[in-house]
Each structure stands twice: as C-alpha cells, then as structure tokens.
C-alpha cells in the first residue's frame, strides 16, 4: 500500500531525481513552455509554483533561496524580473499542463507544461521563427536562381 507515500519517484534515485527536477524547473522558467512526460510535469509543478511565490516576495532572502535551487543566475533574474511580476494578484495556479500525445519509443504520455500569461511571448517567439524561416527560404530560392542562371549561361555540351 502507498499510504503516506507522496511524491513521484520517476524511476530514479534521489540525487538524479533532484537534478532532473531542478533542470526541468530552470527550463520552464527560462522558456515559458517545455514538453516533457506528464508525470515529470506533475512532479515539477509544485517546485515551479513555490519558486514563483518566492519571486513575488522579492526580498534578498527569497532571491538567495531561488538561487540555491535554480541552475543559473539568468533563471533567477528572469524569475524575479519577468515571471513573478506577471502573477502579482494571483494566488497560485501559475502553470498549465496540456497533454500532447504519446512518445514514440516507449509510449509515455507527453505534455506541455507552460506558464500562464506567457502566450504573448510564445507568439512573438513563434512569429520570429516564422520570419527567420521565410528569410532562409527566400535566400535559398535566390541562390538557386543564381545557380540556374550561371548554369544556363554556360553551353551545355561544353567545348568538344
């Protein structure tokens, strides 16, 4: 029986599980949206929510506690300057877990874990990627046109 055995083991030993969750939480705070398995998303949710609550406090002690958990200083800066102010009047529930299908190898259920209110930033990132893709496509078409023009200028049979 699993009475009073809360939490997720994730098939790992303690240090590996702790490292995995710290990395996942850091990625969520840096990227706003991460795809992972549903179990890992559910395991990471309370950690992210506690860190956002620390970020809302905003004092030095909270910053040091966040720095002790997160992997990078950039993540701490982003947490306190960008992420936490979004949720000033909200008491918890900062994340959304959206199921996204199944993993190919082992059939594990995948999910996106994302911060609420990050839709605008995610749309901007998506639009920027689309513009970069379009620019690359235009450059490729231009290069192909130049190449065809160069090939078209030469005699096809050569000098025989």
Swiss-Prot record:
Region (Disordered): 123-160
UniProt keyword Ribosomal protein, yes or no: yes
An MF annotation (GO) of this entry: structural constituent of ribosome
Alphabetical list of Pfam families matching this protein: Ribosomal_L17
Compositionally biased intervals (Low complexity): 142-152
Keywords: Ribonucleoprotein, Ribosomal protein
InterPro entries: Ribosomal_bL17, Ribosomal_bL17_sf
Keyword flag Nuclease: no
Compositionally biased tracts (Basic and acidic residues): 123-141
Family named by the database record: Belongs to the bacterial ribosomal protein bL17 family.
HAMAP family for this protein: Ribosomal_bL17
Subunit structure: Part of the 50S ribosomal subunit. Contacts protein L32.
Listed name of the protein: Large ribosomal subunit protein bL17
